Amino acid sequence: MHLNPSEISELIKSRIEGLEATAEVRTQGTVVSVTDGIVRIHGLSDVMQGEMLEFPGNTFGLALNLERDSVGAVVLGEYEHITEGDTVKCTGRILEVPVGEELIGRVVNALGQPIDGKGPITTKHSEPIEKIAPGVVWRQSVNQPVQTGLKAIDAMVPIGRGQRELIIGDRQTGKTAVAVDAIINQKGENMICIYVAIGQKASSISNVVRKLEEHGAMEYTIVVAATASESAAMQFIAPYSGCTMGEYFRDTGRDALIVYDDLTKQAWAYRQISLLLRRPPGREAYPGDVFYLHSRLLERAARVSAAYVEKETNGAVKGKTGSLTALPVIETQAGDVTAFVPTNVISITDGQIFLESDLFNAGIRPAINAGISVSRVGGAAQTKVIKKLGGGVRLALAQYRELAAFAQFASDLDEATRKQLERGKMVTELMKQPQYSTLSVSEMALTLFAVNKGYLDDVEVSRALAFESALRGFIRSKYGAILDKIETTKDLDAETEKELDAAIQDFKKNGTY
């Protein structure tokens, strides 16, 4: 057998050219210690802040502390199987979660994995959980309303699409109830809702999901759950995951509403992680960047311009603005709004709804304190008819609270003061509303119109809610066209006002309550 050297060299050349190098370049490190879900790693010289790290057993972690000779990472999920000496690899990726329509109607964990037993979720896209908020140039002013269906909120502290409105109060004052009612009321409003449950009992979350299903709200809602039994890391990242899911809808020219229930527990989880990472503690043992923790999350809620949507969708969606409205929840201790986290979030948001345990225990539910609850930008977005009729309500309540304090000491009151007190009592009574019974704009307008025009002046306060309910039923059955007109135009012209006047007078003559 004769071998030609040139043939051999050609053969070797072709083999070398056809060779596919399968070696992957990855930075590796070694686990030095594992304590309470915090892992110290030696090596990993090229790791990025917030990068995903791969541990043995298909477990992932986040690199949070980059020190001179070691890396502090937090494990996402179970960490019992990780031991000293294990190999850790860099992934070169920032933590991402799945986004898209496929998530609607599902319950997922902080990593976007389904936990409702309804099978896997296959989405076309995934996005990083940490994103920079849209700049000032890409934003638009808030001028479209978010109807919560609650009289006290829509009349006194209106919320607009793209606003951040804080719901703050002690435990057991109905904070979750207000947020869930707001979600239920978005039926048919073309609004995708995301409910992020942080550090709550699994049973409480399952109750909320059941209620949302009963009212048909899961058809447009995503639930992101990081229960109390999950690690602090999962509770810390859950709000960012939910926000990314909401941003997908905002950036495709749609409207989304996100509820963070609640951010106090996220701050606690972050404090726990920071202390375990040996970061220096500050006020109330929180780390120095706890303000940034919430500000970078809440700044992502915005109303964005059509140009921004066009840029984000590469020209696929034109002429549509998008919005992400945030309702963060904060729990206070004994009504103390001057604590560290409450003051931080109050200063970040565009207003707050303050719920008081005294009002709640007195049977005034939703227990909204009209005096210190404000909406800084929602007024421009308020529905015209509610704006016209609701102005007097806030004033009546504010004056009533003031006068009621004085009236305790005064024995004889003049007629005007007595009338004002009676009116305040009536308005307070009418602002009460049972849970899961949200009202449409026209139904709300009807109540406000009746109280403003003095149709309830001769009604006993204890019969006010019965009067309101009977009036609603009477008008809907006999004068339904008036309500439909208000619902369509979202305004009250002189002609409709006359018709409504006549209709209520008819009810007072012939109706029963």
Swiss-Prot record:
Its EC number is 7.1.2.2. GO terms for cellular component: plasma membrane; proton-transporting ATP synthase complex. ATP binds at residues 169-176. It catalyses: ATP + H2O + 4 H(+)(in) = ADP + phosphate + 5 H(+)(out). The record marks 373 as: Required for activity. Keywords: ATP synthesis, ATP-binding, Cell inner membrane, Cell membrane, CF(1), Hydrogen ion transport, Ion transport, Membrane, Nucleotide-binding, Translocase, Transport. The keyword Transcription does not apply. PANTHER family: ATP SYNTHASE SUBUNIT ALPHA, MITOCHONDRIAL. Belongs to the ATPase alpha/beta chains family. This is ATP synthase subunit alpha 1.
